[in-house]
Amino acid sequence: MDNMLTFARQQQRRNVRWLLSLSLLVLLATLLSLCAGEQWIAPGDWLSSRGELFVWQIRLPRTLAVLLVGASLALSGAVMQALFENPLAEPGLLGVSNGAGVGLIAAVLLGQGQLPGWSLGLCAIAGALTITLILLRFARRHLSTSRLLLAGVALGIICSALMTWAIYFSTSFDLRQLMYWMMGGFGGVDWQQSWLMTALIPVLIWICCQSQPMNILALGETPARQLGLPLWLWRNLLVVATGWMVGVSVAMAGAIGFIGLVIPHILRLCGLTDHRVLLPGCALAGAIALLLADVVARLALASAELPIGVVTATLGAPIFIWLLLKSAR
């Protein structure tokens, strides 16, 4: 008994150290994001006229958006992996991000460019929810993890094809701009998108507080039922929350892959398996990863800005291949 108590205390201290370290790294990454750009602006110059323009009006809203979207995507990946009992589940791989893109493009086509910005965000959320609900239907049919993964990939390909057809045959300038936007990027984010940032915060906080049902869900469907968890209720709540986070993220920054897949895996490999630590850890680590990727996207080329989706795919694809090989052993 004493050994168990000692182990529990050591594990608790270790978890606290992890969360404190990740919180510190978030602060450092945020500081770097605010300073870095075509012009390096040190914190001492933030209150100058130059700092007023570049830091407070341009970089701060972008940094906040990157932070929230990174946290949302990583949390969505962790939730989907528990929800579908599939370690390879993530919004981009299972087509949820592409579903949000289809919803957005449908709104642009049907609205003839006359719809307000908030309605486009809601259409992206609806598209993400639709794909997530379809995937949940497949999961309830007790498909194997490989079949469920293939179903998600197929849905993603269908959504991608629909977007490509719509963009290719469109004469709308707005729709052609969406082709570049769907590669992922925060270049157009300013304080006008603050309502989208605000829409993410309560869902992020709520998800981070649901460690107990998430731990039970991770045990599997049968143990969860035996422990008295109302599976139908929690599945639908988590589907809505995940679809909301992915839809808002896509509406704000386009499709950004691999954050939701790689971050939860890395934290689990580091020993953070309890969702009481894994969920806030994913939010913090996802924010760090996307903040650093955004800095790379801004600074890699002197004359242009790389799509952040390209940066995350370039860094995430090798890790994804390694995870596939590791899971096949």
Curated annotation (Swiss-Prot):
Q: Which UniProt keywords apply?
A: Cell inner membrane, Cell membrane, Membrane, Transmembrane, Transmembrane helix, Transport
Question: Can you list the GO cellular component terms from the UniProt entry?
Answer: plasma membrane
What superkingdom heads the lineage?
Bacteria
Q: Does the keyword Oxidoreductase apply?
A: no
What functional role does this protein have?
Part of the ABC transporter complex BtuCDF involved in vitamin B12 import. Involved in the translocation of the substrate across the membrane.
- NCBIfam families attached to this UniProt entry: PRK03784.1
Protein family per UniProt: Belongs to the binding-protein-dependent transport system permease family. FecCD subfamily.
Q: What is this protein called?
A: Vitamin B12 import system permease protein BtuC
> Which organism's genome codes for this protein?
Salmonella arizonae (strain ATCC BAA-731 / CDC346-86 / RSK2980)
